[in-house]
């Protein structure tokens, strides 16, 4: 018989030493847990919108003592302008930024969103007039629809400047805004950009367009508030928000993501914003800009220079102790010292101010894959200019709220820049002309590729000339304009045609031809 052998007891593993956390780390963990638990209350989509009250005159109350106003401005032909004109626009932009002190917050918002498809198509359709040319009108409308699909006219791009101040009450805020807004409008006038102050309903309609990127119709009247018991947030809020994920969120049926621009380039290019906005999807770009007090900015730069000099001295002492030449210092220290001295010189002698800027980008898409592709495209544009587009982690709601054109900034990722460095983000590209009504088709914009529809009777100078080299299409352009006027308006068309070039066109349109020559039977009575 064999005695059963007892299994040998396994050696116990030594318990792992507990990781000791600092007080700051414990507080951070507690804060994250509190945020994850929430406050136990049921929240609605309206709670995300960061303002308390909107007044009919366009004054917005953000909290107890913070108020904002919004200005909409149109585009100018910056990319096609001469270098001297571009410099003038850049300098005017610098003057506008310098005119606002540290008590005024500025938010530059560039919005690219889809217009209501039905409204858009109606603007290019030619109404039937009950004659036997209606089939030509239908063919002409089909041609316009094809041209519409070639460009980005499904997207409308709008630009806004939101100004924010601190004030005790609405009366004080209105009194101060009257001067601030007037100065901003004058600066835009110098740049050649048409600008206007938004009323309360116009501001709400703009926010509704951002929160409903597919172009849903906006329906609201101030008289509806009291009987319905609703707030203005109820009329503009989307059906839902979902901020459960770390790096993206959903707004109704849209997939969205908020990123910030990490500026690491030594020099910036004025085409960056233009390329960033050149997309076929919804996009919201916001730049929060706030100037620093000039004396405080100079003191801050001087302190940085002192710190760098102290680091240089320590590096030189270490080099001497180790037997090296004391003039050999780390390259980064020499670079930082030179840049800091250049900034100090700009602040003291070149009429420059120091600004803190937060650059946010919000992408909207119909699917998760489309959103990721749009983010890659935007990141490649940033990489082209030696910058990085970084997704916000666990700050998507705060980032989206900060990107809305309301003047609220909850993202404290800021970059200090001088006036010239801020103004290089020029918000202008090319002026678009897309009138409705009796507007005529004049081709595609060479810069943006969008359709040009212009009603010259609405312009300051309705007269026009067609200029071009031989064979460039001057006659074709004139004939296209004649056909457009004939099909779309009830205007009279008079053609002086010494070479009888337009005779077949006039005959096809059943016009009247008057022949005047020494041998003709028709005459002009000079009396």
PLM segments and residue spans:
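Extended, folded cores of ATP/NTP-driven motor/assembly subunits in large transport
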Residues: 1-430
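Switch/coupling segment of Walker-type NTPase motor domains
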Residues: 77, 109-120, 134, 138-140, ...
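N-terminal pre-Walker A segment at the start of P-loop NTPase domains
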Residues: 428-453
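The conserved Walker
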Residues: 458, 470
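Short coil/loop residues immediately preceding or within conserved phosphate-binding loops
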Residues: 461
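Hydrophobic anchor at the beta1->P-loop junction of P-loop NTPases
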Residues: 466
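Conserved lysine of the Walker
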Residues: 474
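Hydrophobic positions on the alpha1 helix immediately C-terminal to the Walker A/P-loop
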Residues: 477
């Amino acid at each position: 018989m064999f005695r059963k052998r007892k299994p040998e007891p396994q050696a116990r593993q030594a318990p792992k030493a507990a990781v000791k956390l600092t007080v700051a780390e414990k507080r951070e963990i507690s804060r994250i847990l509190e945020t994850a638990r929430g406050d136990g209350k049921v929240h609605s989509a309206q709670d995300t919108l960061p303002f308390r009250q909107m007044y009919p005159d366009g004054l917005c109350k953000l909290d107890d003592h913070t108020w904002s106003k919004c200005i909409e401005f149109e585009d100018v032909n910056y990319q096609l302008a001469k270098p001297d004109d571009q410099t003038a626009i850049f300098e005017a932009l610098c003057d506008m930024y310098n005119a606002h002190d540290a008590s005024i917050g500025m938010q530059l918002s560039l919005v690219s969103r889809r217009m209501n498809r039905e409204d858009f198509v109606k603007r290019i359709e030619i109404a039937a007039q009950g004659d036997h040319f209606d089939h030509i009108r239908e063919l002409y409308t089909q041609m316009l629809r094809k041209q519409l699909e070639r460009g980005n006219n499904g997207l409308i791009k709008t630009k806004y400047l939101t100004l924010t101040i601190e004030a005790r009450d609405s009366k004080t805020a209105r009194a101060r805004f009257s001067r601030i807004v007037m100065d901003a409008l004058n600066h835009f006038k110098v740049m050649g950009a048409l600008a206007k102050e938004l009323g309360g309903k116009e501001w709400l309609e703009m926010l509704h367009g951002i929160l409903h990127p597919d172009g849903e119709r906006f329906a609201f009247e101030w008289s509806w508030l009291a009987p319905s018991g609703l707030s203005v947030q109820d009329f503009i809020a989307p059906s839902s928000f979902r901020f459960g994920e770390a790096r993206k969120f959903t707004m109704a049926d849209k997939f969205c993501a908020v990123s910030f621009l990490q500026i690491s380039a030594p020099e910036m290019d004025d085409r960056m914003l233009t390329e960033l906005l050149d997309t076929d999807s919804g996009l919201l770009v916001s730049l929060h800009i706030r100037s620093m007090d000039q004396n405080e900015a100079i003191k801050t730069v001087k302190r940085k220079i002192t710190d760098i000099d102290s680091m240089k001295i320590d590096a030189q002492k270490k080099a001497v102790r180790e037997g090296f030449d004391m003039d050999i210092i780390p390259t980064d220290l020499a670079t930082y010292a030179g840049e800091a001295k250049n900034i100090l010189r700009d602040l003291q002698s070149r009429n420059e101010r120091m600004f803190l800027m937060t650059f946010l980008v919000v992408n909207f898409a119909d699917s998760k894959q489309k959103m990721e592709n749009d983010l890659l495209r935007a990141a490649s544009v940033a990489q082209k200019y030696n910058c990085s587009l970084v997704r916000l982690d666990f700050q998507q709601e705060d980032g989206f709220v900060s990107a809305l054109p309301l003047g609220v900034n909850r993202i404290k990722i800021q970059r200090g820049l001088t006036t010239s460095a801020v103004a290089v983000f020029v918000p202008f590209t090319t002026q678009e002309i897309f009138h409705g009504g009796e507007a005529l088709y004049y081709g595609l914009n060479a810069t943006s590729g969008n359709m040009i529809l212009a009603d010259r009777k609405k312009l300051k100078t309705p007269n026009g000339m067609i200029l071009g080299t031989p064979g460039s299409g001057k006659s074709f352009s004139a004939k296209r304009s004649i056909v457009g006027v004939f099909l779309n308006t009830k205007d009279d068309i008079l053609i002086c045609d010494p070479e009888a070039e337009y005779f077949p066109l006039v005959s096809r349109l059943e016009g009247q031809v008057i022949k005047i020559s020494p041998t003709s039977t028709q005459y002009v009575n000079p009396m």
